[in-house]
Amino acid sequence: MCTSLTTCEWKKVFYEKMEVAKPADSWELIIDPNLKPSELAPGWKQYLEQHASGRFHCSWCWHTWQSAHVVILFHMFLDRAQRAGSVRMRVFKQLCYECGTARLDESSMLEENIEGLVDNLITSLREQCYEEDGGQYRIHVASRPDSGPHRAEFCEACQEGIVHWKPSEKLLEEEVTTYTSEASKPRAQAGSGYNFLSLRWCLFWASLCLLVVYLQFSFLSPAFF
């Protein structure tokens, strides 16, 4: 039974994608708020997503904020004999920095973000549980809003000792290209206009003023002789 709309969406996307990736095996997704990093039972594998994008809503003061550093922990186990697998998942919460309450708030995510994160999970699952080449991990840099620096004192994952690393080196080249081209558009547009305060233009205007003064002096100078 789903405890929230986001939980239902996670399970829906996971089951649909696993049906395509591994149709011969049965997999389940369990939300476990008590999951601990690196505390694994025998045979279990771990995948840690450190750069998810989510929106938080304070249940006390109604403040909302966006974060591009949502941490999600997955523990995975495959029983090859039974052809059944299990994934336990924990989305780490954040504290509201506006009201200062000690209440931890959950994040909500767009379906498109969940789909990309499930793709990452399946990539890791194929590598660790099936010993296959899972391919490249997806990190949606271009779709992330600028939410400012990460504030570790309000992050549940940071308080439990999880260090935020930079995006994975397996970032898809086409996503980097898309992000770079999109980010360069405003700069290119801004650079296409004339900056009349630049050094080049200042020198031009100074030279023009000197020329005007020189011409005026040249025309007026015969009157003094």
From Swiss-Prot:
Expressed in circumvallate papillae and testis. Coiled coil: none annotated. It is a single-pass type III membrane protein. It is found in: Cell membrane. The chain crosses the membrane at residues 197-219. Pfam families: Zn_ribbon_3CxxC (PF13695). A zinc finger (3CxxC-type) spans 52-161. Keywords: Cell membrane, Membrane, Metal-binding, Transmembrane, Transmembrane helix, Zinc, Zinc-finger. GO terms for cellular component: cell surface; plasma membrane. GO terms for biological process: detection of chemical stimulus involved in sensory perception of bitter taste; protein insertion into membrane; protein targeting to membrane. Residues 1-196 are cytoplasmic. InterPro entries: R-trans_p, ZAR1/RTP1-5-like_Znf-3CxxC. Specifically promotes functional cell surface expression of olfactory receptors, but not of other GPCRs. PANTHER family: RECEPTOR TRANSPORTING PROTEIN, RECEPTOR-TRANSPORTING PROTEIN 2. Interacts with olfactory receptors. Belongs to the TMEM7 family. This is Receptor-transporting protein 2. The gene is RTP2.
